[in-house]
């Protein structure tokens, strides 16, 4: 019975987002196909990265409500002050699960919905960060994200690098050298995200954009 309830909630959320988005369906399906191919082609699995710190600022909470029903891996920082300040979660998704497939579509719709001008102007931010293809376990990937987010700079100390934020990621990659990109995306097959123009961007583990 629990699975039926969850599926109904997912379908309801999916319908709500479809009604609320003003965009042609061809654009969505193109984005969906690109991210699906990149995120799942290696092993049929990926991780959805969510920034839960923005939940309190967002007017539509159906995605966070649904995510509470899913297994997740929290990104645990070694710096105590960051534990509650930067709540990041990884949600494992599989192409073999219809339920996961529905969440995958919902996450794309939600990411596009977050790009609406009125939402950005009101400071709601972007909670859907990326779809990550990797051979790492959830715990291993969470540890890697935690270590990469905190960078030590000589004479300055530790700084918070929000590289996982889709509004930051696309600006950061061009200014990093090859070694820095590879370190940041170590053990990542592809890092997929939707940029500020609503375009799906696929980045390989070497930090280079994947050609369409």
Predicted regions and their residues:
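Terminal low-complexity "docking" segments
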Residues: 1-162, 166-212
